């Protein structure tokens, strides 16, 4: 849903091409798309990737919500140039300077994280992942750790704390403490805790950042922790 603010930030750069790659089709990950203002700019190139998840399911979720009943503007009224990349999407991204690897996440309904390499920088975007779920795992912790080994940035789901359990065990999200251990074990450079529980206040989040920083310092880790907030920018 943060894509709305991103749209406002780049609306004055019509030359930028946009690549839309979605992790999964749960509401909180698709609802912002109709409010993404660049899609209302005539001739703005927008590349959509329907086959990186279940074929056409995520694309349908993005587009079908703009049906006139749930949103007043329908897809045929959108003036930007949608390019639905259905053939060799990974090769298409490679030709545009992005090496992208799909990584299965542990999440109800299935989801994918993405490991993106641009030049010599590695960014792992692992949202909606339950590190230790009660259901069958799509990825084991050792494999997850290797996927983000030495990443410049790891952005990882960190919605819960120990007091949320056992009620929310199996809901598809990780404990903050688990993410701290993952970042340390993988020796990532920057660790961004993401997907905060909406019930947590800014003070709560600041307190969790202080705890995570203390744990990493006590274990002599060089990982730099951040708790994501709107407008956060990291320069590599």
Predicted regions and their residues:
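Active-site glycine-centered loops adjacent to acidic/histidine catalytic or metal-binding residues
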Residues: 24, 128, 195
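Cap/insert and terminal regions of metallo-dependent hydrolase folds
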Residues: 133-224
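Thr-Gly-centered strand-to-loop micro-motif
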Residues: 126-127, 156
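A broadly conserved detector of short glycine/acidic/proline-rich loop/turn motifs that flank catalytic sites
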Residues: 129, 160, 231
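Binuclear metal-dependent hydrolase catalytic cores
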Residues: 1-124, 132-135, 145, 205-236
